[in-house]
């Protein structure tokens, strides 16, 4: 199979969808790999590295898109890429379609077979291709929150860990999944007083046990969450409903009563965000103000640390990439129920029930294509 990897063109997206080790494994199995020149530079992987592993380096994105049978990306296609999508090609990438009707419409119009990293799900409910980037985004969220709390960047002028005689920052983390857990871990490591909210008592027990009570855990009720947010210096939203839009858990009226200079970091922005006022931002312009607070809603946070993110991501995606290349998408998905859950579109049909519900579009069960 011919596998293609274009350069990512989203704002400040420096990750790449494959490493030289992945190229070597694909070519060892008899597959061809073409990579757009410079695709790995942001992750400190040179064209020479890819070529030495067996890839062919091509000059343009158009050539990669037009020739590849299996196209690997990191982030969802954006408008300049819509016209390149085509029937007969399999696209394997993060999609987050519930938050993007234009991308969904473009995929359906093109007839492309698309499989979303973020909805590949095991029988136990694990999300193996979302987890590594959730770890990165969670850890980054505490760092960027601390950064924007500095007065010179519009924040309250609060140090996360405080100093002897001065209280540390109050940090509220909404959601104790992979991203929230990692956010809480780093924030607590910086010395902040951290409170984690979640609806799953067993998850809260795990957090409490692992941190020996150093992180406060609270069952998420509207009343208690609202009161905690109002008192917080930093709020990190890490809520996930796989494949669907994130629920809006922090309202504009609550934000209006927060401390001036408080910071809100919305990790869930890829899925529409979990704060009422959230809207996607970029690494170039990462923040905006609501009332007297600072919102940070960068939709590709891990793109800021591509050397770490690229290798973390591809360590998880490559087993699935190899299945798709070896068997084709139908046989691969028919033999792997986790991969099948990632199926999003095929031949103009929307195969994700959660996306169909959120965007009010017709849903088609993927099972009919896998029989």
Swiss-Prot record:
Question: Could you tell me the Gene Ontology terms of the biological process aspect for this record?
Answer: alanine catabolic process; L-alanine catabolic process
> Which keywords fit this entry according to its UniProt record?
Cytoplasm, NAD, Nucleotide-binding, Oxidoreductase
GO molecular function term, any single one: alanine dehydrogenase activity
Q: Which residues bind NAD(+)?
A: 134, 178-179, 198, 220, 239-240, 267-270, 279, 298-301
Induction per UniProt is: Induced by both D- and L-alanine under aerobic and anaerobic growth conditions, in exponential and stationary phase. In the absence of inducer, high basal levels of activity are observed in cells growing exponentially under anaerobic conditions (at protein level). Strongly induced immediately after deflection from aerobic growth.
Under SUPFAM superfamilies, the record lists: Formate/glycerate dehydrogenase catalytic domain-like (SSF52283), NAD(P)-binding Rossmann-fold domains (SSF51735)
Q: How does activity depend on pH?
A: Optimum pH is between 10 and 11 for the oxidative deamination and between 7 and 7.5 for the reductive amination.
Q: Where is the active site?
A: 96 (proton donor/acceptor), 270 (proton donor/acceptor)
Q: Where does the record place it?
A: Cytoplasm
- Residues that, per the record, bind substrate: 15, 75
Task: Work out whether the entry's keyword set contains NAD.
Answer: yes
Please state what class of enzyme this protein is.
oxidoreductase
Q: What is its main location?
A: cytoplasm
Q: Which reaction is this enzyme known to catalyze?
A: L-alanine + NAD(+) + H2O = pyruvate + NH4(+) + NADH + H(+)
Name the pathway.
Answer: Amino-acid degradation; L-alanine degradation via dehydrogenase pathway; NH(3) and pyruvate from L-alanine: step 1/1
> What cellular-component terms does GO give this entry?
cytosol; plasma membrane
Without the gene, what phenotype results? Answer: Non-essential, it can be deleted. Disruption suppresses alanine dehydrogenase activity, impairs the utilization of alanine as a sole nitrogen source while cells grows to a 10-fold decreased saturation density under anaerobic conditions.
Q: Does the keyword DNA damage apply?
A: no
Which InterPro entries does the annotation name?
A: Ala_DH (IPR008141), Ala_DH/PNT_CS2 (IPR008143), AlaDH/PNT_CS1 (IPR008142), AlaDH/PNT_N (IPR007886), AlaDH/PNT_NAD(H)-bd (IPR007698), NAD(P)-bd_dom_sf (IPR036291)
Superkingdom per UniProt: Bacteria
State which Enzyme Commission number(s) the record gives: 1.4.1.1
The protein's role, per its UniProt record:
Catalyzes the reversible reductive amination of pyruvate to L-alanine. Required for proficient utilization of D- or L-alanine as a nitrogen source. May be required for the adaptation from aerobic growth to anaerobic dormancy. It could be involved in the maintenance of the NAD pool during the shift to an anaerobic dormant state in which oxygen as a terminal electron acceptor becomes limiting.
Family (UniProt): Belongs to the AlaDH/PNT family.
Q: Could you give the subunit structure recorded for this chain?
A: Homohexamer. Trimer of dimers.
- Write down what this protein is called: Alanine dehydrogenase
Q: Which organism is it from?
A: Mycolicibacterium smegmatis (strain ATCC 700084 / mc(2)155)
